[in-house]
From Swiss-Prot:
Annotated compartments: Parasitophorous vacuole membrane
Species annotation: Toxoplasma gondii (strain ATCC 50611 / Me49)
Side Cytoplasmic, residues: 118-435
Name of this chain's protein: Mitochondrial association factor 1 form a1
Keyword entries, A-Z: Membrane, Signal, Tachyzoite, Transmembrane, Transmembrane helix
Name of encoding gene: MAF1a1
Taxonomic placement: Eukaryota, Sar, Alveolata, Apicomplexa, Conoidasida
Residue pairs linked by disulfide bridges in the UniProt entry: none
Membrane topology recorded in Swiss-Prot or TrEMBL: Single-pass type I membrane protein
């Protein structure tokens, strides 16, 4: 990309220099040509022969002016050499054109130099592939058949737009990577209209623990409010934001006092949105890392059972949502990786522990749909490749610890950083040695 910009700037610089030189020369050439075209009138050539007549004529005019009323008439050289008005106007116009063109050329040169200086001052960034690249499949261990593109794994419908792979480093957990959809920017839908399994979608929330605003958090709010409106339930964005913030702050206080334990409240008694709410904290925020680097409330995960009136598409297989907060990308690598791992432990731990509750035993969560956490507004200066590696390490740690037996579904992200990170972990994975 930098080479392309450098070629463009060089072309602009050369064009500006050439334009300035040409306009300066053009202005002087126009002035000279106009000067050469100004010729004396035909009567001037015979001025020496008619000099006597002219003197006599002036004498008569002087005598008439002496005896005439009013001020004497003035004479100028224009009486002998009349100036051509069209030639003078053309000369002035050409001078203006030359000055304007010269100024434009100088402006182009200065703009090119300014852009070149700004480009050199910016730090280099990691290139991001604009399209979804074909990536080789992980090598399956002996005795295990490796899935191919033409033959997806058993039980996976042959639908274009996603890829499902089992990963040995994740205890053969199936991971689905969605391709671009027909929606704006190719984003994956939060929930499917007719799902074949119960999916809990992760909301990449904010440090203040409310649902709403922009990005994915705002999309969750719009989905809930639209379902409420369809069922004639009065619910505004402000009310949803305040209600979700109050419930999640209350849950967080309980979860921080009992890390590693799923806490719950019967939110259905006072909430228009949530029938039941849970929270899980694997590592208490701000104990292992500094919140001034990562942001507040990182590592906490909230699991909500939505009421039927606000469930997406009105399908009860879509009535579970997860809410978490990703670390800020500008944090140091050590703090970022620890906080990211705690975030993934919170997500997988919350689902694993929920499936052991009476609610989960009746209607367990079968899949977790999540974005590449931290790749949006919280990304900062961190490259997507770095986020993909942190995600792979965190997912591997969470699956190894909880073994939730659920499918992971990564939403579409153009760089495929989640897929690349897990493929790298799969290549470097070492099989545990038997006794």
């Amino acid at each position: 990309m930098w080479r392309i910009w450098r070629c463009r700037l060089s072309f602009l610089f050369a064009t500006g220099c050439l334009l300035g030189a040409l306009t300066a020369g053009l202005g002087s050439q126009m002035s000279d040509s106009v000067g050469r075209n100004v010729q004396a009138p035909a009567g001037v050539a015979d001025a020496s022969q008619e000099a006597g007549d002219v003197v006599e004529e002036r004498t008569e005019r002087t005598e008439q002016q002496v005896f005439a009323l009013g001020p004497p008439r003035r004479h100028s050289s224009e009486s002998l050499f009349p100036r051509n008005a069209s030639v003078t106007a053309r000369r002035r116009r050409n001078r203006r054109i030359a000055l304007i063109a010269t100024a434009v050329g100088v402006a182009v040169i200065l703009a090119a130099l300014y852009v070149l200086r700004r480009r050199r001052a910016q730090p280099p960034q990691e290139p991001e592939p604009p399209t979804r690249l074909r990536t080789p499949r992980p090598r399956a261990p002996s005795g295990q058949q490796q899935p191919s593109e033409s033959e997806p794994p058993a039980g996976v419908p042959m639908t274009p737009g996603f890829l499902t792979l089992p990963f040995t480093c994740l205890r053969d957990t199936k991971v689905t990577f969605f391709g671009p959809s027909g929606r704006q920017h190719g984003f994956t839908a939060l929930y499917d209209p007719s799902p074949n399994k119960r999916v809990a979608t992760v909301d990449a929330g904010t440090n203040r623990l409310f649902i709403g605003g922009g990005g994915m958090n705002g999309e969750f709010a719009n989905t809930i409010i639209e379902e409420a409106r369809r069922n004639r339930i009065p619910l505004t964005a402000t009310e949803l934001s305040a209600e979700s913030q109050e419930i999640q702050e209350r849950l967080l206080r309980d979860a921080e006092r009992r890390p590693g334990t799923l806490v719950e409240i019967d939110s259905g008694r006072f909430s228009r949105v949530f029938a039941r709410s849970f929270a899980y904290v694997a590592i208490v925020p701000n104990t292992v890392w500094d919140e001034s680097e990562t942001g507040k409330n990182v590592g906490a995960t909230f699991l909500h059972i939505l009421k039927p009136e606000v469930t997406p598409h009105g399908n009860q297989m879509n009535d579970v949502m997860l809410y978490t907060v990703a670390p800020l990308g500008n944090a140091s690598d050590s703090a970022y990786n620890l906080a990211y791992k705690a975030t993934m432990l919170g997500i997988v731990g919350a689902v694993s522990e929920y499936n052991k509750t009476p609610w989960g035993e009746v209607k367990p969560v079968e899949a977790i749909r999540l974005p590449l956490l931290g790749a949006g507004h919280f990304r900062g200066r961190r490259g997507l490749h770095s986020i993909g590696r942190a995600n792979a390490v965190a997912v591997e740690a969470a699956i190894t610890r909880f073994d939730p037996r659920v499918e992971l579904q990564f939403m579409y992200e153009p760089s495929d950083a989640a897929l690349r990170g897990l493929m790298e972990s799969e290549r470097t994975y070492t099989f545990p040695q038997g006794d």
